[in-house]
UniProtKB/Swiss-Prot annotation:
Pathway: Amino-acid degradation; L-arginine degradation via ADI pathway; carbamoyl phosphate from L-arginine: step 1/2
HAMAP family: Arg_deiminase
Protein name: Arginine deiminase
GO CC terms, sorted: cytoplasm
Active site as annotated: C396 (amidino-cysteine intermediate)
Lineage: Bacteria, Pseudomonadati, Pseudomonadota, Gammaproteobacteria, Vibrionales
Domain of life, per lineage: Bacteria
Family membership: Belongs to the arginine deiminase family.
One Gene Ontology term from the biological process aspect of the record: arginine deiminase pathway
UniProtKB keywords: Arginine metabolism, Cytoplasm, Hydrolase
Amino acid sequence: MSKLYVGSEVGQLRRVLLNRPERALTHLTPSNCHELLFDDVLAVEAAGEEHDAFARTLREQDVEVLLLHDLLVETLAVPEAKQWLLNTQISDFRYGPTFARDLRQYFAEMDDEHLASILLGGLAYSELPIKSSSMLPKMKRPLDFVIEPLPNHLFTRDTSCWVYGGVSLNPMMMPARQRETNHLRAIYRWHPTFAGQDFINYFGDEDQHYDNANVEGGDVLVIGKGAVLIGMSERTTPQGVENLAASLFKSGQAKEVIAIDLPKHRSCMHLDTVMTHMDVDTFSVYPEIMRKDLDTWRLTPKGNGEMHVEASHNYLHAIESALGLDQLKIITTGGDSYEAEREQWNDANNVLTVKPGVVIGYERNVYTNEKYDKAGIEVLTIPGNELGRGRGGARCMSCPIERDDI
């Protein structure tokens, strides 16, 4: 088995990709936070300390933690990778030929550590020391961005997702996140950890526009035994699901995809904000959203390059069938109706399973954590008063790269 392999949601987690929030959060303000998909600004130092506690908890569970900034710095050390990233990030069409040329020259001479920080964290015109004869910079305000910050890179789950023996490099729905994918494309192509390794690129690694075929990793659950559960949320489309499923089937990496149509609003922007897999037969569910009658489809390969699409009237039964289980154990969000709604908003259902029956979640979700504990699930709590304001929990903030089967 390749070490670049994710066989489940609940098998032993061995290696994971995180991104510590730093420079990007310093560029997040009340006037731009909504455009950058945040509801509020975060206290930068406190958010970093909370993220350090998350990484430390993972390491205490014998999980190897890779950090996106470090991987990007090491990738930029490869001349071909650096040139490719500069060409994709700083195009003539985006900046005009004169300004693009000046920017590429400036960034090409920059040390890799500084360049990685700017690619992830952004650069304002007031922070740009070079002059250009181009019209564009003369028409911009000092606090406008030359390079937009990517604060949502904190949520490494979404930009790429490893499914069995390969990876999907996801075409993101929102413009504020679309540039993130190129960083992962470069890392998986040129970084020594990934270059030359035996894994499949399912989807998203082509130089093309994917139109409406969007997929985000928060909607993708690798539930094991060749099955994949995908939510069609406000960020993942049926076109994206079918394209990913076709590639999974063509490569022989999955035997079925279960697709659930979710409500299209922010409180359940991804499937993993309302449903996560905690043990072989156990799921956390927010019942106000995850009703049994949600429209569900089973996608399976026909064997001739096409797929069979069949309506399923109960997503829980579809999961039970895929996993060979008689009945799933469902743990709903804790507290009364008000408390459950509040805790779901604060990512009570968005936990990261590190091994069967052991999860990481925010300590603030006391009612739901107590319910998990009573059901036999061990919760390793982490602080999240700042991180949680970004609308993502432990699962959102992690991209498993190596995890055992169930």
